[in-house]
């Protein structure tokens, strides 16, 4: 696995964990929610910008993206 891919995976796991903690979800629930409402795709597509933000800002961005795609958590 290349270093870039490894960094992206580590970052995504960290973001899913932070999202889960923020909303009181399990990791599995958080991943399913983010995957269903395009949060995972957003993290992958916007990695270069998002990984430079604080985790609080990233969780907020994920919440907005998922809400725009039908998610209920705000």
Language model feature labels by segment:
Residues 1-74:
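C-terminal alpha-helical interaction appendages
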């Amino acid at each position: 696995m290349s270093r870039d891919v490894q960094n992206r995976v580590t970052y995504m796991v960290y973001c899913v964990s932070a999202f889960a903690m923020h909303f009181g979800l399990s990791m599995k629930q958080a991943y399913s929610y983010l995957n269903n409402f395009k949060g995972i795709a957003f993290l992958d597509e916007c990695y270069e910008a998002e990984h430079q933000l604080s985790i609080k800002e990233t969780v907020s961005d994920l919440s907005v993206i998922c809400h725009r795609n039908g998610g209920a958590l705000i």
